[in-house]
Amino acid sequence: MNETNDNDIDQLIYLFSKLPGLGIRSARRIALYLLQDKDVRLKSLINNLVEIDKKIVKCEICGNMDTENMCRICSSEYRDKSIIAIVETVAELWAMERSGNFKGLYHVLGHNLSAASRQNPSILRLPELLTRCFAENIKEVIIATNSTLEGQTTAYFITEYLKEHPAKISRLASGIPIGGELDYLDEGTVSAAINLRQPFE
């Protein structure tokens, strides 16, 4: 397959190459770095991954990742519990948190909708969202899906789904470029998009 002729090393390189942002060359460098000091580097990584796997759970309310069943955001008494931002994944939640400009709650969908693949809307956590909106007396829902075609499709579907709830529905400002994803934007851009959010039409 390659120069090493070692299936185990090939498998390690392959696994790293599947991580976001890593190609085969970067994966090969990481694998070599770990194997050159296997007893320290590789074992330390393995032990830490095992511990993380034991501790990290999905928040049963919003879908964030934390060490408790209710994440620190949902359990905080300092958050504005009348506003909820809908994000596609935890990556977008983290991006909004890095901006330091959003103090409300979140709802992680876990997916988006693609017209091309004809995904079933049931993959989204919308029944849970509607239940939260009524139970927590939500006043504003900020749709913070990405500015991709899939994100826009998802946003329109969410708006239709929430029609029976009286909350104001807004969308992040158009400063986010078309096709842009929150996770790749700097904190200033995300902060401005939150501040300048507009009613969803």
Swiss-Prot record:
GO MF annotation, one: DNA binding
PANTHER family assigned: RECOMBINATION PROTEIN RECR
Family to which this protein belongs: Belongs to the RecR family.
Zinc finger (C4-type) residue numbers: 59-74
Keyword Zinc-finger in annotation: yes
Gene3D superfamilies for this protein: 3.40.1360.10, RecR Domain 1 (1.10.8.420)
Organism: Rickettsia africae (strain ESF-5)
Pfam family name, one: RecR_ZnF
InterPro entries: DNA_Rcmb_RecR (IPR000093), Rcmb_RecR (IPR023627), Rcmb_RecR_Znf (IPR015967), TOPRIM_dom (IPR006171), TOPRIM_RecR (IPR034137)
Top-rank taxon: Bacteria
UniProt entry keywords in alphabetical sequence: DNA damage, DNA recombination, DNA repair, Metal-binding, Zinc, Zinc-finger
UniProt keyword annotation of Membrane present: no
Protein name, entry field: Recombination protein RecR
Stored SUPFAM superfamilies: Recombination protein RecR
GO BP terms: DNA recombination; DNA repair
PROSITE patterns in the record: RECR, TOPRIM
Role according to the record: May play a role in DNA repair. It seems to be involved in an RecBC-independent recombinational process of DNA repair. It may act with RecF and RecO.
Domain Toprim: 82-177
